[in-house]
UniProtKB/Swiss-Prot annotation:
Class of the enzyme per the UniProt entry, highest EC level: transferase
UniProt xrefs under HAMAP family: RNApol_bact_RpoC
The protein's name: DNA-directed RNA polymerase subunit beta'
Family: Belongs to the RNA polymerase beta' chain family.
Gene symbol of the encoding locus: rpoC
Gene3D superfamilies the UniProt entry points to: 1.10.132.30, 1.10.150.390, 1.10.1790.20, 1.10.40.90, 2.40.40.20, 2.40.50.100, RNA polymerase II, clamp domain, RNA polymerase Rpb1, domain 3
Domain of life: Bacteria
UniProt keyword annotations, A-Z: DNA-directed RNA polymerase, Magnesium, Metal-binding, Nucleotidyltransferase, Transcription, Transferase, Zinc
Organism expressing this protein natively: Ureaplasma urealyticum serovar 10 (strain ATCC 33699 / Western)
Pfam families hit by this protein: RNA_pol_Rpb1_1, RNA_pol_Rpb1_2, RNA_pol_Rpb1_3, RNA_pol_Rpb1_4, RNA_pol_Rpb1_5
Residue numbers binding Mg(2+): D527, D529, D531
The UniProt record lists the keyword Zinc: yes
Subunit structure comment from the entry: The RNAP catalytic core consists of 2 alpha, 1 beta, 1 beta' and 1 omega subunit. When a sigma factor is associated with the core the holoenzyme is formed, which can initiate transcription.
Cofactors, names only: Mg(2+); Zn(2+)
Length: 1305
């Protein structure tokens, strides 16, 4: 422990002495509380003398009842006078009458268990010994036959199963005959003497009994007899295991196993694998300082009584925690066993009782691992201690990582267009509840801010509470004052990324709904159809400062996943801005242009108004001299601080003048979408230029759409101070709402364009489908080929319809159509909606099990009969049925996808949560070579070179093709430089990457580069692991669940895409046989490609190393990616499909694996139009590929099969080389997301993810120390996380918060 909290945490196996040191007393009675007095029973499970008093400072008998007696122990009832909270931490213990094996060390999945590995006996044999089924040899004694010992130490004798017992019986009989022979020798084979000898007769009798398996006999007696004569000792139950573990010499065992591994001929057979696991286990226990016999318990701890309470229900009944039932059972059986031992009961009864005790303790620790778990009254298995740790409802996830918090509330959200960017409207009732303590403190305050005495509004707390309850008029000014003191934090579930939680300054509003600023809805993914949001209040000064400086909504301009503005206006606002920035010819010219375009342009000058100032132009609009969209002229001098390329008359509209007033005065004038902030000389009529000539050639400019507005905001963010952006956005929001109202855009069914051309296409396609059916019936086509061609034909028909409708809505006829305006501006709707409204609905998908084994090779997940009608025409009954079928499938898919995507995000976070920015520069000279990502199949660009290198650091100087320096090494590649590199024709660039950062923990600033959400160098302490996981997980729900056709002909592979493909890549799942690509294992040249008539596939023969050949047979209908004479490298695709990552690692190395995963992940996301920065994918991949497995330890002290991080391995190897010792060697490993978290090095973080029991067992066996490097382990222990403000001083955080607070407008 330190001032700042816990520094590290170690877990180990508890010794009996340690259990005793925790305990405050032994529990000997199974009673809990007295049914009359309801007080805890002495020596029972709730005994006050052991666990502490039930009431603060009051003993059991009532002799002492005040704080003044604190620390005394009552003479009568022996209860210490202290606070009752100690009942949450004080423990008791139970002295067991017989040793009991800990179930975690006997039953472990995946087996073998720790005890099984230490004693080198099978998992099943341990089980049989512990549960009193079979005996184990404790000492082989002096008992030989043919010069060999009959029994081996730790051999398990099976006398119960009819099949396996013959061998054990024969061994016992052999021993008995040995005894007979020995006695015969002693008595010189005299018959009389032998008959008289009791032991001889006994040996003969036992031999007869063992010969016939039907004769019952006492195993105990036989074994006691054998022990007396030969010294061979047998044992049963946990006692026997305890004795064997006690006598185990770990040093000897360690050396023995090591020798056996060295002598092993094959390093990969099962025997060697088991030896390696044994070596690992023995070394763990040896190095941990624990003793192996502690795995068998002689006493067990009793958890504090408050952690397993008894709760009284209505009607005088009680309910109790399941743990108490387990403890009761243990105590009853333990006490019964003690009594039996005291009365010398028969061995068979004692063994049975010991077995029952073993089972009782097992069910306490892990009830579900047993074949028949202990069940309650409702036949439900009771919750054991293991169940309390595991799963979503377990201790880790329910209580330690996520807690319910005070000072919070939730309500429905409605839109609040009148709010500023950083404000939220909170209902008055909510404020009274949430801010209650602060309001009361203000109401009873007796001094003002300057320390002067003042008359309080209320004399005491009670009166203040009454005033609040009555909602007295006097309290409202106080409430207004109080809510200015601290912001509130809003959260919308599901919180998929960090923008799901933001802070706002509260404003009191009427009603019961929270009013939310319309621009933050995108970040929260909120809409106003009944969504609810939770409100939290930061209490401490640090929390308030953090909320204002970091969490405040107005600082979240860019989305962290792609660095694009996330506060772009939507819907109504876009419609308003579109209307405002639209251009029209003056009204008379507009009418004339349809009849006589040439004359209209000449006449234009007579209606072209020129203004001297902005106010003059706006006044003319208000007086209705001109319309808001009419093209007008205004002198450039009317704009004081704006710079123009020349002086003259700017050709614009009143709408654009109003729009530009929202921006800072020095921001460029936005007039033309195509030329947002560059050279605007073509928009200005110069001093000596002809106005008539200019107007004759004038073409109307496009208005601003959602896309172009986003670019403007992006530019604004780049050139302005951070506090200017939210102010501007609020002005744009206000303009948007105002002018969407003025534009009076409405919608009606008659606005939808009419379109009849489709019936001709239908006629053609129907004829083609009929023809295909004939071909199928004649046997010219298979059913699969027919199906594929039909689906293809209808898809092409729909494409034609879509093309026609696009042409229609882009025509002049529909330019003022409200629905078209909505779609064009980006406010609502798209071409697909038009196609379905006016054209045809097209093909629908149907439910299909993608995992099924399919001989046809074609996935039939589309109904082949299309829906020909549009929604305006109305659907027929069968069309309506198919349509509903498809729509419902869409709904279920969405629900399934949300759950799967959420789980994937959780796995991603767990894998990367410890990755934090550490230090400025790790000094690495390695980087990754980055090229444009192209889809090699159709040669289209997936991600440009510019997108991949912007915001990163170069490794070496970069020169263009003329050898001119573009950028030096170790410098940041900005947007401008990235453009220069791309335009200069350079194909590849080496840049710094998180994949090669040599920081021991985390990543350095230079290997990461710019922070996408601020466009500045990433700050140290940023938790990029979590941000990366959220950036990849959050858009996961937008990915499809379908396995797409790659279209067209059968034989083209159906490759898993969308969400399933991402899962396949990150979890390292092998692709199915029918979609797996064959890759070359060697570097060489394609010698020949032969068609295989038997399999209908190909044989691809590759020549390598001058005259060696290797042949790759492909599956039927495989699509080849190479041709004869091509040069191939190891890891290159020979056929289409998905590569198995493990194969790629084997033949092409880890770098190729990393590049392949980046490329494939980007392919999936970008095909869906989702942009994610490469850097985030690299952070994830670095966590999946940063481990190596030791193949040869050298002199390092590591052992074969051990998995450690690359950076640790490098450090060990370097120190070995420096000291002239033999360094270790290792191979790279790729772990899927399921296994990566458990390899993190922190047992707390791993145990809170999955496999809690296994991870804690392993950690305890090796006395693992958790250095608390990641975020989760610190959250669990209640420390500040080692990231962000958790690394700064409190004063620094508060000062920064106050500074940012001043920037509010």
């Amino acid at each position: 422990m330190s001032q700042k909290g816990i520094k590290s945490l170690t877990i180990s196996i508890a010794s009996p002495e340690q259990i005793l040191s925790w305990s405050k007393g032994e529990i000997t009675k199974p009673e809990t509380i007295n049914y009359k007095s309801l007080k805890p029973e002495p020596n029972g499970l709730f005994d006050e003398s052991i666990f502490g008093p039930s009431k603060d400072y009051e003993c059991y008998c009532g002799k002492y009842r005040k704080v003044k007696h604190k620390g005394k122990v009552c003479e009568r009832c022996h209860v210490e006078i202290t606070e009752s909270i100690v009942r949450r931490e004080r423990m008791g213990h139970i002295e067991l009458a017989a040793p009991v094996a800990h179930i975690w060390f006997t039953k472990e999945l995946p087996s073998p268990s720790k005890i099984s590995l230490l004693l080198d006996i099978t998992y099943k044999e341990v089980d049989q010994v512990v549960y009193f089924v079979n005996y184990i040899v404790l000492d082989e004694g002096n008992n030989e036959y043919d010069g060999k010992s009959i029994f081996n130490k730790k051999e398990v004798l099976d006398l119960t199963s009819p099949k396996n017992s013959i061998r054990s019986r024969n061994k016992l009989r052999r021993t008995l005959r040995n005894i007979q022979e020995r006695i015969e020798e002693e008595l010189n084979h005299e018959r009389e003497a032998l008959i008289q000898d009791f032991d001889y007769r006994l040996a003969v009798t036992y031999d007869q009994m063992l010969k016939d398996s039907n004769i019952p006999f006492s195993v105990k007696d036989v074994m006691a007899f054998i022990e007396k004569h030969t010294g061979v000792r047998f044992g049963i139950g946990a006692e026997a295991i305890h004795e064997l573990l006690e006598k185990l010499n770990l040093e000897e065992e360690h050396e023995k196993i090591k020798q056996a591994i060295q002598n092993s001929p094959n390093a990969y057979d099962q025997k060697t694998k088991r030896l390696l696991r044994r070596l690992e286990c023995v070394r763990w226990i040896k190095d941990s300082g624990s003793k192996p016999e502690w795995m068998v318990m002689t006493r067990i701890p009793v958890t504090p009584s408050e952690t397993r309470p008894i709760i009284s229900l209505d009607g005088g009944r009680f309910t109790t925690s399941d743990t108490n039932n387990f403890y009761r059972k243990i105590i009853i059986r333990n006490e019964r066993l003690k009594q039996m031992q005291a009365t010398d009961a028969p061995e068979i009864l004692l063994d049975n009782e010991k077995r029952l005790l073993q089972e009782a303790v097992d069910s306490l620790f892990d009830n579900n691992s047993r074949k028949k778990p202990v069940v309650g009254k409702d036949k439900r298995p009771l919750k054991s201690l293991s169940n309390h740790l595991k799963g979503k409802q377990g201790l880790f996830r329910q209580n330690l990582l996520g807690k319910r918090v005070d000072y919070s509330g939730r309500s429905v959200i409605v839109v609040g267009p009148e709010l500023k960017m950083y404000e939220v409207g909170i209902p008055a009732l909510m404020i009274l509840k949430l801010f209650r303590p602060y309001i009361i403190s203000e109401l009873i305050r007796k001094r003002d801010e300057f320390g002067n005495e003042i008359q309080p509004i209320c004399a005491n707390i009670k009166l203040a509470e009454q005033k609040i309850l009555a909602q007295d008029d006097e309290i409202w000014p106080v409430v207004e004052k109080v809510i200015k003191q601290r912001p509130v934090i809003l959260n919308r579930a599901p919180t998929l990324h960090r923008l799901g939680i933001q802070a706002f300054e509260p404003k009191m509003v009427d009603g019961k709904a929270i009013r939310l600023h319309p621009l933050v809805t995108t970040a929260f993914n909120a809409d106003f159809d009944g969504d609810q949001m939770a409100v939290h209040i930061p209490l401490s000064k640090e929390a308030v400062a953090e909320a204002r400086s970091i969490l405040l909504a107005s600082w979240h301009i860019l989305g962290p996943k792609d660095g694009k503005p996330i506060i772009t206006p939507t819907q109504d606002m876009i419609l308003g801005i579109y209307y405002l920035t639209k251009e029209k010819f003056p009204q008379p010219i507009e009418e004339m242009i349809l009849k006589d375009p040439v004359q209209a342009r000449i006449e234009f000058i007579n209606h072209f108004h020129i203004f001297a100032t902005q106010d003059e132009a706006i006044r003319a609009y208000k007086l209705k001299t001109i319309r808001i969209n009419d093209v007008i002229g205004i002198t450039t001098k009317a704009f004081d601080n704006k710079s123009f390329s020349k002086e003259g008359i700017l050709v614009t509209t009143v709408g654009k003048i109003i729009f530009n007033q929202a921006f800072p005065t020095n921001f460029p004038y936005i007039n033309d979408v195509k030329n947002l902030y560059g050279d605007n000389q073509f928009e200005i009529i110069g001093m000596h230029e002809s106005i008539l000539d200019y107007l004759k050639a004038y073409n109307l400019k496009e208005p601003l759409t959602k896309k172009t507005l986003s670019t403007v905001i992006d530019y604004l963010y780049k050139v302005s101070e951070i506090e200017v952006v939210p102010q501007t956005m609020d002005k744009i929001k206000a303009l948007g709402f105002k002018y969407s109202m003025i534009s009076a855009t409405s919608i009606s069914a008659f606005d939808i364009p009419s379109y009849d051309q489709k019936y001709e296409y239908f006629k053609e396609t129907d004829e083609l489908v009929a023809k295909l059916r004939e071909f199928y019936l004649d046997g010219k086509l298979t059913d699969d080929e027919r199906y594929t061609k039909v689906v293809q034909a209808w898809s092409q028909t729909k494409d034609k319809v879509t093309h026609d409708i696009e042409k229609l809505i882009n025509s002049d006829e529909y330019k003022d159509n409200p629905i078209v305006i909505m779609a064009k501006s980006g406010a609502r709707g798209n071409t697909s909606n038009f196609t379905q409204l006016a054209g045809m609905r097209g093909l629908m998908s149907k439910s299909y099990n993608y995992d099924q084994k399919n001989n046809s090779g074609v996935i039939k997940d589309t109904i082949e009969i299309p829906i020909k009608h549009s929604f305006i025409e109305g659907l027929s009954v069968s069309e309506y049925f198919n349509s509903s079928f498809g729509a419902r499938k869409g709904m279920t898919d969405t629900a399934m996808k949300t759950a799967k995507s959420g789980y994937m995000t959780r796995k991603l976070v767990d894998s990367t949560q410890a990755v934090v920015i550490k230090g400025n520069d790790c000094g690495t000279k390695e980087g990754i070579i980055v090229r444009e990502i192209r889809n090699t199949k159709d040669n289209t660009s997936i991600e440009s070179l510019k997108d991949r290198i912007v915001g990163r650091f170069s490794i070496n100087p970069i020169y263009d093709t003329k050898n001119k320096l573009i950028i030096e090494g170790d410098k940041l590649i900005t947007n401008e430089i990235a453009n220069m590199i791309q335009n200069s024709g350079i194909r590849e660039v080496e840049v710094r990457s998180p994949l090669h950062c040599s920081s021991l923990y985390g990543v350095c600033q230079k290997c990461f580069g710019l922070d996408l959400s601020t466009n500045k160098l990433i700050e140290t302490g940023t938790a990029i692991g979590v941000i990366a996981a959220q950036s990849i997980g959050e858009p996961g729900t937008q990915l499809t669940m379908r396995t797409f056709h790659t279209g067209g002909v059968a034989g083209d592979t159906n490759i898993t895409q969308g969400f399933e493909r991402i899962k396949q890549l990150f979890d390292c799942i092998q692709p199915q046989e029918n979609e797996k690509a064959i890759i070359s294992q060697v570097k060489g040249t394609v010698d020949r490609i032969e068609k295989d008539s038997n399999t209908n596939g190909y044989n691809v023969v590759i020549k390598y190393n001058k005259d060696n050949f290797v042949s790759y047979p492909t599956r039927p209908n495989a699509v080849l990616r190479i041709k004869t004479g091509d040069n191939v490298v190891a890891g290159q695709k020979i056929t289409e499909g998905s590569i198995d990552v493990n194969d790629l690692l084997k033949y092409a190395g880890i770098e190729n694996v990393r590049h392949y995963i980046i490329k494939e992940v980007q392919k999936v996301y970008r095909m869906q139009g989702i942009e994610i920065s490469d850097k985030y994918i690299e952070v994830i991949i670095s966590q999946l590929t940063n481990k190596v497995t030791i193949t040869n330890p050298g002199d390092s002290g590591l052992f074969v099969g051990e998995t450690i991080s690359i950076n640790e391995f490098t450090e060990v190897a370097q120190s070995m080389l420096v000291n002239k010792k033999k360094p270790p060697s290792a191979i790279n490993q790729v772990f899927g997301l399921d296994h990566a978290p458990s390899k993190s090095g922190s047992f707390l973080s791993a145990a809170s993810f999955q496999d809690t029991k296994k991870i804690l067992t392993d950690a305890a066996a090796r006395s693992q120390k958790d250095m608390l490097i990641g975020l989760k382990e610190n959250v669990i222990l209640g420390n500040l996380i080692p990231a962000g403000t958790g690394l700064k001083d409190v004063e620094e955080v508060i000062a920064y918060g106050e500074e940012m607070y001043k920037k509010q407008y």
